[in-house]
Amino acid sequence: MIVPEDARRFAGRALGSWRRRRGTTPPAVDATGFYAATTVGPGPRGAVLATESMSGPAGATTWRVRYRTLDAADRPVVASMAIAAPTGPAATPRPVVAWVHGAVGVAPGCGPSRTGFDAWYGDRLLGEGCVVVAPDLTGLGVEGSTHPYLHGLTAGRAVLDAVRAAAELSTTGAGPVTALAGHSAGGHAVLWANELAATAEGDGLDVRLAVPMSPIGDLTVTMARYADDDGRAAFPVQLAATWADVEPVVPADALTPAALARLDDLHTKRLAGLQHTFRGHATRWIRPGGLTTGAWAAALERQSAGRRPGAAPVLLVHGEADDDALVGWTTTLAETIRTTGTEVTLRTYPATDHMAIHDAAQDDVLASLSRALGDDG
């Protein structure tokens, strides 16, 4: 694809051996202090604040990184990520692929980089000569701030600044050419990052392709379904409980007293644990109409994806048997993106559910990334 001398070091490796942790165990403990709350002063976005070596794929050098980004109110905050690069010097600047995880919980200890390098297709992308960055997203990983679940502006900024941080680490060999990929909530972050990259927020970056996989796009439609569903209440609860710092909304307007009484669980449990806490029909936890009227409705509309032009073409992939994020949502999303003037391709996969999309779409996704990152314009 791009850097053949890097590819040889990864020949024959299995695909996707480093994948997202999905457990019921409590969030990871920060044993080294790397993720301790950190005050961040003036400085450029994406500035590297600290690094720490960590285990990762064979043939790659892998680090945890703390870097500077902005929250939705333009306040500087510290975010964390994992980054892996082929070991050894790069003959030419390496392209960067940012992989954005789906829902994991909202506590700092849920940050994927705390437990390892976590990116689908990571082995293959490294073998193709790419640098792979896996941002935790603001509030996940580093202590001291709240992760506003599905808040597009916050997530999009953290993704773009993770790419900037990769380029600042000279040992990675990372250049400006970038692709963005992510699953579910991570797909929402990718869409936002691509849209931000088309503005001054993307200065210095060359984004070539965005690949949202089974993404969340229209937050109003998504939350309306989840708030009147059996078994998915943890998702609107996470959103309603974490947006007060980034939007003019009040959690109690959307959450029932029963939900408000259990919000401490958000600080101690991963997603699967939260799904157990907030089990049963969502109306036990979400006020009827609470997320679809008034200030909450306006906030969800503001943070929905696909409303603004993107810097790069978009490849949407979605499983037709997905009952978590419906394929019809993404069909509509493709139409919405098209109205912005952004090039968009939609590919759907029969008999494929929310998680199976990774394997079903891998050939299409990897081939598309190869073409985009290998295009010299």
Segment roles from a protein language model:
Residues 99-102, 134, 316:
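Structural cue for short, hydrophobic secondary-structure segments
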Residues 149-170:
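Alpha/beta-hydrolase active-site loop
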Residues 164-235:
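Primarily recognizes the serine-hydrolase "nucleophile elbow" in alpha/beta-hydrolase
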Residues 14-16, 22-24, 213-306:
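Accessory cap/linker subdomain of secreted extracellular hydrolases
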Residues 1-89:
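Catalytic-loop region of hydrolases
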Residues 71-129, 142-143:
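Short, surface-exposed "cap/lid" segments of acyl-processing enzymes
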Residues 310, 315-322:
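Short beta-strand/loop motif that positions the catalytic acidic residue
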Residues 288-298, 324-377:
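C-terminal catalytic histidine-bearing segment of alpha/beta-hydrolase fold enzymes
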